[in-house]
């Protein structure tokens, strides 16, 4: 029987939460699925919400870079706090360069899960499998 574990956004909100995930994963689980990083505290923003805001800012030609910077800070902080080698800065720079009015909302918002999954895969020592595959 195939065993899959799913962790929501608050379970992967920061490096401390990643450590908890690693500690509780049953070795019999073959697949781990994660949401985008969630809130670290009540007044914090979910990465998914920030991505939706970026999409709205792009649609109405409003500056979105400060929102994107919050996402960059979150992911780079997790990477650095866990001592990971995944060059997330490259994927973030690529995404930043792709941002435009014609970008699919689904694609943009899915980047939160994608980047979180890349980080957790390295941290757990699991192979990364892109959901699109």
Where are these predicted regions, by residue range?
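Nucleotide/pyrophosphate-binding catalytic subdomain
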Residues: 1-133
